[in-house]
């Protein structure tokens, strides 16, 4: 396929048009008075959002050169989202400002490589200063503030803070769509996995359709159990103890299942069978987790263990087990604290090494089940469109909160970037390098300017006053007042601000050093001739 090539100024100008189209669509969402953007969906209702990365990913431009520019800035948003989970609009605004200012200077004859050096130098100083002014996050109230600012909703802030308090730093917080109108928090304490009872005849509470076992023994195996002869020795020992039994196996079927059900119905003893969670190697790991949590052993032929020679000493214990049609929850397992801690440390080590996002998510889930718990925020709304928008906002708030716990917080509303202004301005540089530093200085004003403009105010006036205010004092665009940002609860996670600045600078530097752009030539549609008449037909 034939290619079209553009060089130097012409290439950069074409890409800049794409950058501006994307950034202008994204930046209207910035700040407490930012607007929403409506995205068309081929199927179903349109998506209304103020999430920068969601908007950026949707934008495809017709001109291939403009599209390349737009895609570069979309990458800034995407990368910031991957690292910090929020701050994508800020990153886009910073990137647009750096590219725009940089291009003016390159057009005027500045050397792009010198400018790049200056940008990198300035960003390094700004990042160091951001880390220096960062404050660690303390207490439930601080967490609630970070979440409330990100989601623009105080109720959501309180929900996330409560969820984090209840599941701890190793816990997992997930989002689900609720059937109702309200957003609620549901916390599952203990080890829960997505497998229910094998037979509904095993239930003990017919109103709730669940089996509740108090102080049960827990048999854990990766085998398929079909013969009752294999289970008999261990069953007899459990019956003598007068305790119920939970069997976690690959499957329980045939004669074994029938015997368990008949004994349950006759009231001889209570046993509930559930299938083992997960698949393949993950199943083995999860069974081992359950064994460590309950103080039992996994009965597997890989270790030369057979079911029929199992004794009661190999079984796990728990204070309570609740089994529903779809879930099994083990509460208060009897495993030794040091064994559980060793397993947690092992999973943490795997988490640090893994490169797969999927594996990371699964390891995090396992860690939560062993260490903290799992909190589910059920998002409710009146319409499907509102539900999607609300879910995206809460997801951002959740990510922002995690980032804040990790690296601390700085003043929000673009104030933190303005607080590092003097440090960046003091950098000693000459020539094109000094120009690069000035480009960063102009760019770090941009978020404040944009937040003010979205609130219907003159951005330049706010920026100039901010330069004279003492550090930490900023402009609250929601109320129009000048306040101590951290005291007023207007905060941003340091990680979010830092990632936005670093990613914007990285893409801007690449953009300015571009000298040629190659794109596919659009194919001309040659109209195919119509079919000839078929004589005599009506």
Curated annotation (Swiss-Prot):
Q: Which positions bind ATP?
A: 29-32, 86-90, 413, 476-478, 492
Asked if the Swiss-Prot or TrEMBL record annotates the protein with the keyword Nucleus, the reply is: no
Keyword Lipid metabolism attached: no
Query: InterPro entries, alphabetically?
Result: Chaperonin_Cpn60_CS, Cpn60/GroEL, Cpn60/GroEL/TCP-1, GroEL-like_apical_dom_sf, GROEL-like_equatorial_sf, TCP-1-like_intermed_sf
Q: What is its EC number?
A: 5.6.1.7
What the protein does?
Together with its co-chaperonin GroES, plays an essential role in assisting protein folding. The GroEL-GroES system forms a nano-cage that allows encapsulation of the non-native substrate proteins and provides a physical environment optimized to promote and accelerate protein folding.
Pfam families registered for this protein in UniProt: Cpn60_TCP1 (PF00118)
Check the UniProt entry and state the signal peptide residues, or none: none
GO cellular component term, pick one? cytoplasm
What is any one GO biological process for this UniProt entry?
Answer: protein refolding
The text of the family note is: Belongs to the chaperonin (HSP60) family.
Superkingdom assignment: Bacteria
Q: What is this protein called?
A: Chaperonin GroEL
Quaternary arrangement and interactors, per the entry? Forms a cylinder of 14 subunits composed of two heptameric rings stacked back-to-back. Interacts with the co-chaperonin GroES.
Residues passing through the membrane, by range: none
Tell me the compartments it is located in.
Cytoplasm
- Catalyses which reaction? ATP + H2O + a folded polypeptide = ADP + phosphate + an unfolded polypeptide
Gene Ontology MF annotations: ATP binding; ATP-dependent protein folding chaperone; isomerase activity; unfolded protein binding
Keywords associated with the record: ATP-binding, Chaperone, Cytoplasm, Isomerase, Nucleotide-binding
């Amino acid at each position: 396929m034939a290619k079209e090539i553009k060089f130097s100024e012409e290439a950069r100008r074409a890409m800049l048009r794409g950058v501006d189209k994307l950034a202008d669509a994204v930046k209207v969402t910035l700040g407490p008075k930012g607007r929403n953007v409506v995205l068309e969906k081929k199927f179903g209702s349109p998506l209304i959002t103020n999430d920068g990365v969601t908007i950026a990913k949707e934008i495809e431009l017709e001109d291939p050169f403009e599209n390349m520019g737009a895609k570069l800035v979309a990458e800034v948003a995407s990368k910031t989202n991957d690292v910090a989970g929020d701050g994508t609009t800020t990153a886009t605004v910073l990137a647009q400002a750096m590219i725009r200012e940089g291009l003016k200077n390159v057009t005027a004859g500045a050397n792009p490589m010198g400018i790049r050096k200056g940008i990198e130098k300035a960003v390094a100083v700004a990042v160091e200063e951001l880390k220096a002014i960062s404050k660690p996050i303390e207490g439930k109230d601080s967490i609630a503030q970070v979440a409330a600012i990100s989601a623009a909703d105080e109720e959501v802030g309180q929900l996330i803070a409560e969820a984090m308090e209840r599941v701890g730093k190793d816990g997992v917080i997930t989002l689900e769509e609720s059937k109702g109108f309200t957003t609620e928090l549901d916390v599952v304490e203990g080890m829960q996995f997505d497998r229910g009872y094998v037979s509904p005849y095993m239930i003990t509470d017919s109103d709730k359709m669940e089996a509740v076992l108090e102080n049960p023994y827990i048999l854990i195996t990766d085998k398929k159990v079909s013969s009752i002869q294999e289970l008999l020795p261990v069953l007899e020992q459990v019956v003598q103890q007068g305790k119920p039994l939970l069997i976690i196996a690959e499957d329980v079927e045939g004669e074994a299942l029938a015997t368990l059900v008949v004994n349950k119905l006759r009231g001889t003893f209570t046993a509930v069978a559930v299938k083992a969670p997960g698949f393949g190697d993950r199943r083995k790991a999860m069974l081992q987790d359950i064994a460590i949590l309950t103080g039992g052993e996994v009965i597997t032929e890989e270790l030369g263990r057979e079911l029929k020679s199992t004794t009661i000493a190999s079984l796990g214990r728990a204070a309570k087990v609740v089994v529903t049609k779809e879930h099994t929850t083990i509460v208060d397992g009897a495993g030794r604290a040091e064994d559980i801690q060793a397993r947690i440390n092992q999973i943490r080590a795997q988490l640090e090494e893994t490169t797969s996002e999927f594996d990371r998510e699964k390891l995090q889930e396992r860690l939560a089940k062993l260490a903290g718990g799992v909190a589910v925020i059920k998002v409710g709304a009146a319409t499907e469109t509102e539900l999607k928008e609300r879910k995206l906002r809460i997801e951002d708030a959740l990510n922002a909160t995690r980032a804040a716990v990790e690296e601390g917080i700085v003043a929000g509303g673009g104030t933190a970037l303005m607080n590092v202004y003097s440090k960046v301005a003091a950098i000693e540089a000459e020539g094109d390098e000094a120009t690069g530093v000035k480009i960063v200085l102009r760019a770090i004003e941009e978020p404040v300017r944009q937040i003010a403009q979205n609130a219907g105010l003159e951005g330049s006036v706010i920026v100039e006053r901010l330069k004279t205010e003492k550090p930490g004092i900023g402009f609250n665009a929601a109320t129009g007042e000048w306040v101590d940002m951290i005291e007023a609860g207007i905060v941003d996670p340091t990680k979010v601000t830092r990632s936005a600045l670093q990613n914007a600078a990285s893409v801007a530097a690449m953009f300015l050093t571009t000298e040629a752009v190659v794109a596919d030539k659009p194919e001309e549609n040659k109209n195919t001739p119509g079919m000839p008449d078929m004589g005599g037909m009506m």
